[in-house]
Curated annotation (Swiss-Prot):
Gene Ontology biological process terms from the UniProt entry: coenzyme A biosynthetic process
PANTHER family linked: PHOSPHOPANTETHEINE ADENYLYLTRANSFERASE
GO molecular function: ATP binding; pantetheine-phosphate adenylyltransferase activity
Enzyme Commission number(s) from the entry: 2.7.7.3
Function: Reversibly transfers an adenylyl group from ATP to 4'-phosphopantetheine, yielding dephospho-CoA (dPCoA) and pyrophosphate.
Coiled-coil segments: none
Protein name: Phosphopantetheine adenylyltransferase
Amino acid sequence: MRALYPGSFDPLTNGHMDLIERAAVLFGDVIVAVLGNPSKKPAFSVEERIRQIRSSTAHLQGVEVVSFDGLTVNCAKEHSADLILRGLRAMSDFEYELQLAHTNRSLDDTLETVFMATSTQHSFLSSSVVKEVARFGGAIDHMVPKEVALDLNRLFNSAFLPH
């Protein structure tokens, strides 16, 4: 099976990595689809995020990283995905994710959405939280892959560098 895992990944967190690693085992092929959303002001360009994800997932078999704009269902069709993968950190994520799943299903009734619970040790992580911690010089090496931590520290000129 081919799973499409869409998101902004700005930046990629260890929570995202956990989901990608587990999905690669479960589904075989995982397409990490980086959304280029012109209405948002990302910390990293789409190209930088793709580089970070490719570097962080290089050890995994069956993981492909692509960019997309527009509807997730169109990206899924373009890449022959069998399902859309979404992560849930808490019940508060579920309502929004369920609404997206229903919307996607209304656009393509052959495409399923599969929800995976985030591992407990990563359930507090969000890209926004990571950026905020990095912006104020806090330790982020336990929150993101090493390359992402280095990029964030360069971006925010943080005194903290990961080991």
